[in-house]
Amino acid sequence: MTEAVSNFEAPPMSRRVFLNALLSSSVGVVVVGTLYPVVKYFIPPSSGGAGEGVIAQDALGKPISVSELLATHAATDRVLAQGLKGDPTYIVIDNGAVANYGLNAVCTHLGCVVPWNAGENLFKCPCHGSQYAANGKVIRGPAPRSLELVSATVDGDNVRFSPWQGPDFREA
């Protein structure tokens, strides 16, 4: 039986078959190399492990220090940070402490970033005039919904954002 296997010879590969295989492989590598960044662009960044969330970061990508934040901001301020999936998210300061919730800063009408207006104690969308209360509840349209809630917890000297669990307390 070993003699039958040892006498077997593979047919020689012709030059045409070799060049076709080489060309097909080269085209495949170029196509995969071109499509990879395109596909990666459409996949949102990870927001951390399930339930773990992400550490709030400033505009430069550095973690925000809670002690520094509370020392430099008013007792009822809203501070813009980088939150879940890289979305702009407000850290809510109530009575001089970080609240247990944060607010996604993206307007629910057309996706503009909504700035905090401390003088009027509300959020005003610069695109179409939607207004939100200090807790993110919509008070004037055309926005159809309140700003999205995220859970905010103090983790050492950092703020950790995670997806909001449970009912919306603003709808009571």
From Swiss-Prot:
Q: What is the scientific name of the source organism?
A: Synechococcus sp. (strain JA-3-3Ab) (Cyanobacteria bacterium Yellowstone A-Prime)
The molecular function GO annotations come to:
2 iron, 2 sulfur cluster binding; electron transporter, transferring electrons within cytochrome b6/f complex of photosystem II activity; metal ion binding; monooxygenase activity; oxidoreductase activity, acting on paired donors, with incorporation or reduction of molecular oxygen; plastoquinol--plastocyanin reductase activity
Q: What else is known?
A: The Rieske iron-sulfur protein is a high potential 2Fe-2S protein.
What does the cofactor field's note say?
A: Binds 1 [2Fe-2S] cluster per subunit.
- Where does this protein chiefly localize? membrane
Q: List the disulfide bonds.
A: C112-C127
Which sequence ranges are marked TM in the entry? Answer: 17-39
What protein am I looking at? Cytochrome b6-f complex iron-sulfur subunit
| Known role | Component of the cytochrome b6-f complex, which mediates electron transfer between photosystem II (PSII) and photosystem I (PSI), cyclic electron flow around PSI, and state transitions.
Q: Where in the cell is it found?
A: Cellular thylakoid membrane
Q: Catalysed reaction per UniProt?
A: 2 oxidized [plastocyanin] + a plastoquinol + 2 H(+)(in) = 2 reduced [plastocyanin] + a plastoquinone + 4 H(+)(out)
Whether Transport counts among this entry's keywords is yes
| UniProt keyword annotations, A-Z | 2Fe-2S, Disulfide bond, Electron transport, Iron, Iron-sulfur, Membrane, Metal-binding, Thylakoid, Translocase, Transmembrane, Transmembrane helix, Transport
EC identifiers of the protein = 7.1.1.6
GO terms for biological process, alphabetical: photosynthesis
- What HAMAP family would the database entry show? Cytb6_f_Rieske
Its cofactor is: [2Fe-2S] cluster
